[in-house]
Amino acid sequence: MQSIFGTDGIRGRFNEEITYSLAYKVGYALGSTLENKNPILIGRDTRISGNILLQAITQGINESGKKFINLGICPTPAIPYLIKEENLSSGIMISASHNPPEYNGIKIFDHNGQKITKIFENKIQKIIEESKQNISIPTKVVPLKANKDLMDTYIKSLIQTMDGESLSGLRIILDTCYGSATTCARKIFQSLGADVKVINNSKNGLKINLNCGSTNLEPLKKAIRESPADMGFSFDGDADRVIGIDSKGNVLDGDHILFLWGRELMEQKLLTNNLLISTEMANLGFENSWKKIGGILYRTDVGDKYVHDAIKKKRSVLGGEQSGHILSKINNFSGDGILTALQISKYCKKKNINLNDWLKSSFEPFPQKLTNIKLGFNFNKLNPENKILIDESIKNFQTIYSENCRVYIRPSGTEPVMRVLVEAKNHEKVDSLSSEITNKLFLEIDKIRY
């Protein structure tokens, strides 16, 4: 059996890759594996399938002899924070993050609030493989009561990260993309004194991430044009990532956030070895500018768990991804979009600078082009010979690397596509190189018989 775990837990379309039976087995396997007898914390985003999967997982946990606490709809980072705070045995988040509504997923956290290790994944996988049960969706799904007190504990923890700094006088627009941030983003920013407007703020599992949120910034840009604001923040479905927009509609992505936040820490002598951790997707303009001010950028494979591992290994205090996953020491390196948005707002208020001017002081990004080549098959399921052939082609293309040009190619961890990233100092070079590489790689992939 192929591993059910990808780069960020278990992910797939509901009733296809992610079934009621699989969710039940995950709950049972987790409960059976844990020696710690404290309850398992469970949360979910707003997807329609979330409540059904919650029912399945809790059924499995119950039959394993363990107990659970239902947090209800919540941001993913609430789970790891509360595991540590309440001394719980582990946690599960039911979410497919930024993916469309028909997808869902299962993220598992250990007793330290960290994503489980490969060894732990293998233990769960083994129990699932040995199970012969095929559990069907019950005719009636009974809603489970959510623990509101724990959610309030998480909200208070975010407010406390502001160290008493008020956001009064700041006009901020939030796009909660019909997802997890709908539960608390408005409340948090308003409690800090900000003048807040929120769009896409209903808990709608059919609309989550659809033409909104951190992967589609047009609704937020439009809102800022129509209702002038100092800044805006757009979250993804489970609120573990965020992208900012300044008053002029310019984008503050994860690279800009890392540069600006990192520079603040560097100036305060709080950035260990002047080191930032990011991934192979980080913009070359970011890397070059960071080096010019004395910083070091360490790149990892794509995925916040790889960033997290490198942060621990290199003893860094800040890292993240261009997509808006930012991991900081403030909350034990758990990506939290609301926390990140609060910190950006706090710096602007303390420095008495608008986000537009602060963003101008960062770096000029190189033009980038990201192309997805549809594979029609799961790359990880290819036979070794064909996989080696494609890997060799990728290596050859990626040798094109200098201060002015870079190519990065990888199979997606969540979709059957090959991602081709090309960046250079001008758009013409990017377009021509991207077209050349994409066409050649497509022909190589098309030769594969699987």
UniProtKB/Swiss-Prot annotation:
It catalyses: alpha-D-glucosamine 1-phosphate = D-glucosamine 6-phosphate. The modification Phosphoserine is found at S97. Mg(2+) binds at S97, D236, D238, D240. Keywords: Isomerase, Magnesium, Metal-binding, Phosphoprotein. CDD domains: GlmM. It is an enzyme of class 5 (isomerase). InterPro entries: A-D-PHexomutase_a/b/a-I, A-D-PHexomutase_a/b/a-I/II/III, A-D-PHexomutase_a/b/a-II, A-D-PHexomutase_a/b/a-III, A-D-PHexomutase_C, A-D-PHexomutase_C_sf, A-D-PHexomutase_CS, Alpha-D-phosphohexomutase_SF. Catalyzes the conversion of glucosamine-6-phosphate to glucosamine-1-phosphate. Belongs to the phosphohexose mutase family. This is Phosphoglucosamine mutase. The lineage of its organism: Bacteria, Bacillati, Cyanobacteriota, Cyanophyceae, Synechococcales.
